[in-house]
Amino acid sequence: MDNKTPVTLARVIKVLGRTGSRGGVTQVRVEFLEDTSRTIVRNVKGPVRENDILVLMESEREARRLR
């Protein structure tokens, strides 16, 4: 990874559910470590649980809610 690429750290506060055609993606609510008042919903591929720290390459995009 390039040192010039800005990244944002976020902590998983709640696992919302599984999504994707085969359930391979997990939808989670995360709060940013720099600004704990700001939370967004993201899709995560792979194993994830509450209190995990995610490295977000792009922090403005929010996932659509599960139906």
From Swiss-Prot:
Biological processes per GO annotation: maturation of SSU-rRNA; ribosomal small subunit assembly; translation
InterPro entries reported in the protein's UniProt record: NA-bd_OB-fold, Ribosomal_eS28, Ribosomal_eS28_CS
Keyword Repeat attached: no
Alphabetized UniProt keyword annotations: Ribonucleoprotein, Ribosomal protein
GO molecular function, one term: structural constituent of ribosome
Entry similarity comment: Belongs to the eukaryotic ribosomal protein eS28 family.
Protein name: Small ribosomal subunit protein eS28
Organism whose genome encodes this protein: Candida glabrata (strain ATCC 2001 / BCRC 20586 / JCM 3761 / NBRC 0622 / NRRL Y-65 / CBS 138) (Yeast)
